[in-house]
Design a protein with these regions (language model features):
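Beta-strand-rich recognition domains
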Residues: 1-45, 75-77, 81-102
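Short, small/polar residue-rich loop motifs at catalytic or cofactor-binding pockets
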Residues: 41-44, 230-233, 386-388
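Short, surface-exposed beta-strand/strand-loop-strand elements in extracellular ectodomains
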Residues: 43-56
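Vicinal oxygen chelate
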Residues: 108-117, 159-180, 185-215, 234-239, ...
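Core segments of cupin and vicinal oxygen chelate
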Residues: 115-171, 210, 217, 227-230, ...
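Short, structured interface segments
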Residues: 175-178, 233-257
Length: 409
């Protein structure tokens, strides 16, 4: 059983100019039970907050600045209203948290999903990178149940392939899809590495400099030459023909130079988030119980290797599934500078670039029931057949998380 302190609302910052009364209202989901409203006050001395029609914060509660914690009782559907009189200028930050327990039964990461405009070109690209295993075609060109699970109103038309560093292919794969005809969406991948959502995946190599030279000679587009991060990691970013980013890092084990790429394994899948605490707790509930710090800042070569002229800074944590799983790792990053608050791709799941992540679960029926009971938003109906299926849920930033596994009665 995993326990997490979920953010049910916020964090939202409400600013008020002197003499300009402000009212804000919203709804949010939770479960029946106790919770906390966490308020950070910066200069506001006349505000009122109601949750489900009950006054929980009054002006006398704001006589001091800093953090204020108010106990709450929540229900599945909730309302919140924030009213600031405008007697003083300032801001308040509001977050509602709720301690929650669940067992979703995650077993491993199956793949990250990448959409391409040209399947033949993309297959050749992964061959150039040194991916040895491939399943193609890896699924039917049409499927109404799968299409609706991905957010389409009816059917789609696709090519799909699964790429693996090993042959015969093993997970985690790169699930590559070319949406065709009316289901194609002609929008480019995220242009910069700080965009909210899934911007890249990281592979380790035993010969970073050799791979860089080899791939550059093959015409692969790199952001820069290999660079060294403040934590000592040597890395480089490259792009596929659509502009989707991948990252290569030097593995601890160093091998002799080879005449072809020396990729070893998928190290992590990146997720840029708007609030690190909120995302960390969401994935803790899913089973990501192990963590390591990942905050970095720097300028010069380090920033340029990320595609930026000025200094960069992000807070982060690398999280992985616990004992009894394959140790899949997610790289959560909250960018401080440069900051980009544009939201991730909207449904359906057909935007060019990395647009989804898949996890296998022990019992899909039980996992869906638990996610629905906890109030998480489901993208569409269950795709697949009576014995095995898949479904998408949104994480706190709208990143599409796919759960797949056996279905029970």
């Amino acid at each position: 059983m995993n326990q997490a302190n979920l953010t049910r609302f916020g964090p939202r910052v409400f600013e008020c100019a002197q003499g300009a009364p402000t009212t804000f209202s919203a709804t949010f989901r939770a479960i029946d039970g106790t919770a906390k409203l966490v308020l950070q006050n910066s200069g506001i001395d006349d505000a009122r907050i109601e949750v489900n029609g009950h006054a929980v914060v009054a002006p006398q509660d704001l006589r001091t600045t800093g953090e204020i914690v108010v106990p709450l009782t929540l229900q599945p559907e909730n309302t919140i209203e924030v009213r600031m009189a405008g007697a003083s200028a300032g801001a308040i930050s509001v977050r509602v948290t709720q301690l929650t327990q669940a067992d979703l039964g995650l077993l491993r990461q199956g793949y990250f999903g990448l959409n391409t405009s040209d399947m033949a070109r993309q297959r050749a690209f992964y061959d150039t990178l040194g991916f040895k295993g491939e399943i193609y075609p890896a699924g039917p060109e049409t499927s109404t149940t799968f299409a609706r699970a991905l957010g389409f109103p009816d059917d789609y038309l696709i090519h799909v392939s699964l790429h693996s560093l090993e042959d015969p292919p093993v997970m985690p794969f790169v699930d590559t899809v070319q949406f065709r005809g009316d289901s194609y969406r002609d929008e480019p991948p995220y242009p910069d590495l700080n965009h909210i959502g899934m911007t890249y995946a990281t592979y380790s190599t035993t010969d970073l400099d050799g791979d860089f030279a080899y791939l550059q000679a093959k015409g692969v587009d790199f952001v820069s030459a290999p660079a060294t991060a403040p934590n000592g990691e040597r890395f480089v970013f490259l792009k596929d023909q659509d502009g989707t980013y991948l990252k290569l890092i030097q593995a601890v084990e160093v091998a002799a130079a080879t005449s072809s790429p020396s990729l070893v394994r998928l190290v992590n899948t990146n997720m840029n988030v708007t609030d690190l605490e909120r995302s960390r707790e969401f994935y803790r509930l899913l089973g990501f119980t192990e963590s390591a710090p990942g905050s970095l800042a720097g300028a010069g070569e380090f920033a340029a290797a990320h595609g930026f002229d000025g200094p960069i800074e992000f807070e982060g944590v690398d999280i992985s599934l616990g004992e009894g799983t394959d140790g899949a790792t997610l790289q959560l990053r909250q960018w401080k500078r440069p900051h980009d608050d544009a939201p991730p791709y909207s449904p359906p799941v057909n935007h060019l670039g990395i647009d989804r992540i898949n996890f296998y679960v022990k019992d899909l029926t039980a996992a869906i029931r638990t996610m629905n009971e906890l109030g998480f938003e489901q993208l569409g109906p269950i795709g697949g057949g009576p014995g095995f299926g898949l479904v998408f849920f949104f994480d706190p930033d709208g990143i599409k998380v796919q759960l797949a596994g056996p279905r029970t009665a």
